[in-house]
């Protein structure tokens, strides 16, 4: 039986957790039915090469995960059977172009990023393989180079590729089960993806624009109103695209925010407030505007916030909040 070749591109909080569990199962231990390759860069890659990837979690304590190979160049790898792409949205195009030569007809591709149209973007650049729409729920981050700290067990939700409706990835189920990865398989994963997107995009845009935590947004009626307006714009787009969401999805999404610590910041908020060179602003605001235009849905609140955030990202300041 041939080994399954698994490649994890991006070893941040998400890739480090799921990739770490895969490597710990198949590369670090006696199970030799799969090779697990890591694609990373910089000091993080150097630390992984030197000491392995260390993953710390209340779920399993501390484990050291040694991949078959950790590299910066996908060109060094063999043909890949399973790609797990866990880069930031702004690095997706570069990652997908770099992996094209390692994608075969039956290669499985999961990219559980925060966007609503990730599979469509991948389809344009990869032009092959079986792309399984997916999203994740996890709290995890790089504590320092080579070390991942996680909270509760992460979960990945994925479903069938619309272009390959007869293909069910039973081998991937086996890999996840052996690695104790919590997953949920759906015939159609798009509702789950959009349910997450409606929450994360709206709160990301408002938190970044006003530089306010989730708790502060919920406490201020004016900010909460804008969050709900963006949610309704996304909901209308989803409806036009025949994505089946619960009628009460907006209320459910607002209630979900109350489950987070009040001082929670979004990653977009942190990136813009820290004036980082790159952010996922386009993944949230830009995507809503583009998809709204595509299906004929007006997105005035998103449009206003997105334009102002582009100014903020150019270091023009943060607006005052009233109400």
Predicted features and spans:
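NAD(P)+-binding Rossmann beta1-loop-alpha1 motif at the extreme N-terminus of oxidoreductases
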Residues: 1-61
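Rossmann-like NAD(P)(H) cofactor-binding subdomain of soluble oxidoreductases
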Residues: 62-147
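Short, well-ordered alpha-helices that flank and scaffold nucleotide-derived cofactor binding pockets
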Residues: 20, 24-28, 97-101, 124, ...
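Residues at the C-termini of beta-strands that transition into short coil/loop
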Residues: 40, 59, 72-74, 113, ...
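NAD(P)-dependent Rossmann-like dehydrogenase/reductase catalytic/cofactor-binding core
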Residues: 2-4, 34, 177, 228-323
